[in-house]
Amino acid sequence: MNNENSKFGFTAFAENWNGRLAMIGFSSALILELVSGQGVLHFFGIL
């Protein structure tokens, strides 16, 4: 990961943002489940 000329976008900057957005999504899903009493799929009517 030290190669800043990577062709696939695996840079420290991209990985930091990916981790941050993943935690926001996970936290949002957890809060939604706690507030509504339903899972995410049930909340949106998928299951």
Curated annotation (Swiss-Prot):
Coiled-coil ranges from the UniProt annotation: none
Chain positions of motif Chlorophyll-binding motif: 15-20
Molecular functions (GO terms): chlorophyll binding; pigment binding
Lumenal, thylakoid side: 37-47
GO CC terms: photosystem II; plasma membrane-derived thylakoid membrane; thylakoid membrane
Major subcellular site: membrane
Cytoplasmic side: 1-14
Keyword Kinase: no
Subcellular location(s) of the protein: Cellular thylakoid membrane
GO biological process, one term: energy quenching
Residues making up the signal peptide according to the UniProt record: none
Gene disruption phenotype: No visible growth effect of the single mutant; double hliC-hliD deletions are out-competed by wild-type in high light (500 umol photons/m(2)/s). Quadruple hliA-hliB-hliC-hliD deletions die rapidly in high light but grow normally in normal light (40 umol photons/m(2)/s). Quadruple mutants are sensitive to norflurazon. In an hliC-PSI-less mutant phycobilin and protochlorophyllide levels are reduced. A single gene deletion red-shifts the chlorophyll/carotenoid ratio.
Membrane-traversing stretches: 15-36
Keywords from the UniProt entry: Membrane, Photosynthesis, Photosystem II, Pigment, Stress response, Thylakoid, Transmembrane, Transmembrane helix
Conditions for induction: Transcription moderately up-regulated in the absence of photosystem I (PSI), probably a monocistronic operon. Expressed at very low levels during growth under normal light (40 umol photons/m(2)/s), induced under high light (500 umol photons/m(2)/s for 6 hours) with maximal expression by 3 hours and no change for 24 hours, after growth at 4 degrees Celsius for 6 hours and less induced after nitrogen or sulfur deprivation (at protein level). Upon return to normal light protein expression is stable for 3 hours, then decreases.
Membrane topology, as annotated: Single-pass membrane protein
Keyword Ligase carried by entry: no
Described purpose of this protein according to its UniProt entry: Forms a number of heteromers involved in photosystem II (PSII) assembly and/or repair under high light stress. Required for binding of chlorophyll and carotenoids by the Ycf39-Hlip complex. The Ycf39-Hlip complex binds D1 at an early stage of PSII assembly along with Ycf48, ribosomes and ChlG, the last enzyme in chlorophyll biosynthesis; it may be involved in chlorophyll reuse and delivery to D1 in the initial stages of PSII assembly. HliA-HliC and HliB-HliC heterodimers bind chlorophyll and carotenoids in a 1:0.6 ratio. The Hlips might regulate tetrapyrrole biosynthesis, maybe at the level of aminolevulinic acid synthesis and probably stabilize PSII assembly intermediates.
Stated family: Belongs to the Hlip family.
Quaternary organization: Forms heterodimers with both HliA and HliB; these are associated with photosystem II (PSII) assembly intermediates containing CP47 (psbB). In the absence of CP47 (psbB) and HliD, forms a homooligomer in vivo that binds 2 chlorophyll a and 1 beta-carotenoid per monomer. Cofractionates in an approximately 50 kDa fraction the thylakoid membrane with HliD. Associated in vivo with monomeric PSII.
Annotated protein name in UniProt: High light-inducible protein HliC
Origin species: Synechocystis sp. (strain ATCC 27184 / PCC 6803 / Kazusa)
